[in-house]
Amino acid sequence: MTAAAESTVALGGRFARELNELAVPWEAEEAPDPKLLVLNGPLAAELGLDPEYLSSEEGVRFLLGNHVPDGATPVAQAYAGHQFGGYSPLLGDGRALLLGELQDSRGRLRDLHLKGSGRTPFARAGDGRAVVGPMLREYIVSEAMHALGIPTTRSLAVVATGRQVRRDDMLPGAVLARVAGSHLRVGSFQYARVTENTELLRRLADHAISRHYPEAAAAENPYLALYRAVVAAQASLVAQWMLVGFVHGVMNTDNMTISGETIDYGPCAFIDAFNPAAVYSSIDVGGRYAYANQPVMAEWNLARLAEAMLPLIDEDQEAAVPVAVEALGGFRRQYSAAWSGGMATKLGLAAGEPEAAAGAEVQDLVDGVTGILKDGSVDYTLFFRNLAKAARGDSRPVRGMVMDLAAYDAWAERWQDLAPDAGLMDRTNPAYIPRNHLVEEALAAATGGDLDPLHRLLEAVSAPYSERPGLERYTQGAPEDFGTYMTFCGT
């Protein structure tokens, strides 16, 4: 790779320049023996980065933060947050760095961020490092979410550092290169608010408006418009999580983005057997972030954002509170509409028309199918794929999944009367998701040096709606001996 190719890597520093109070210049830890494990070539091209360069020795060092382009200044970002309901006034990037910003092929500004790049001033007791398994988990799941059409941060690369990292055992270290619309979080606003620097809070909000919701700038109250936009984005996002059976696992306020992108995939999972109380994270002992609790927790987080933004919504705090409460009230309406409309589409009964999804008959069918799923602990993803076969006249696969055939048959008769669109169902209900047992299989193999299962899984989940020969095992639930699934964040 030529020097000319390297010179095309230009990173901006807008966040650090406009919000220097939230940015601490810092250097990544040197990796002793780096090795590129996986590179997202299409994403690299979208960002104007040469995949060949990124695969070179210098390019790999760039992905680790060990080779910083001229003019770039990596920074650790400061933020606060509520973690499992407990407030921490200072969290920040303890093991991560914002390398800078890139403009993508559509003219959007995107953050290039490293995870596992070493201790920063925010590290507290942590070692600042990450290990191969959790970084590849984020790569797999974030790219699967993108393929599902769900707003998410993206994964550009995972690089093994060549350093062993102590967790319960000694494990191979790694760095994830992550791409996002920004890394602004609810916790960013909480940190700015706790400084009692209203001018900083205003600059942060202006930065968020400029990057994510420029239409808010023209509103009578731009900051209220920003808040309403974040509420709407999160209502849509969480509904999309619920519709595919995604459990985030750690919905702290520092893990909720202003952009409406899913971020931080540490202890995430997808439900197999439908269970509203599903919890996979080892640290969520009380079930705070269980599958069915996710909309409630998102609303709770947004209330914390409103508290942080009160000085911007109205200079008179007493006047600001009812305005913020009214704006937050939009979340339940918007989430309910997105969930009901999405479920109707999963049933092949609506092509996105709100009036169709809102029909009482359709809503009754939505309620009925969730009852069938729950009562029989039915595989959530496979059920809807097989239901599309029933829409085409073959009900044997789906009937073979349910416990109460009489209840299903009564429900299905009413559903069939509405002439469900099987093609719409196939375009809406994925055949392939990152099933927990397949993710663990890929991570275990990769930790041992075998990347083939990882690449096969990525092949499946990168085109989730199109069934292909040879990928049948990727549509199936976990084997009986897989046992109870528990995830760990890897810190």
Curated annotation (Swiss-Prot):
Query: Which EC numbers does the record give?
Result: 2.7.7.-, 2.7.7.108
**InterPro entries registered for this protein in UniProt:** SelO
Protein task: Nucleotidyltransferase involved in the post-translational modification of proteins. It can catalyze the addition of adenosine monophosphate (AMP) or uridine monophosphate (UMP) to a protein, resulting in modifications known as AMPylation and UMPylation.
Please identify the protein, giving its name as recorded.
Protein nucleotidyltransferase YdiU
GO function term, MF aspect, one: ATP binding
Q: What class of enzyme is it?
A: transferase
- Sites where the protein binds Mg(2+): N255, D264
**What's a Pfam family this protein contains?**
SelO
Q: Which organism is it from?
A: Pseudarthrobacter chlorophenolicus (strain ATCC 700700 / DSM 12829 / CIP 107037 / JCM 12360 / KCTC 9906 / NCIMB 13794 / A6)
* Residues binding ATP, per UniProt: G92, G94, R95, K115, D127, G128, R178, R185, D264
Q: Record's family?
A: Belongs to the SELO family.
HAMAP family the UniProt entry points to = YdiU_SelO
| Keyword list, A-Z | ATP-binding, Magnesium, Manganese, Metal-binding, Nucleotide-binding, Nucleotidyltransferase, Transferase
Top-level taxonomic group: Bacteria
Name the catalytic site residues.
D254 (proton acceptor)
Q: Where along the sequence do coiled-coil regions lie?
A: none
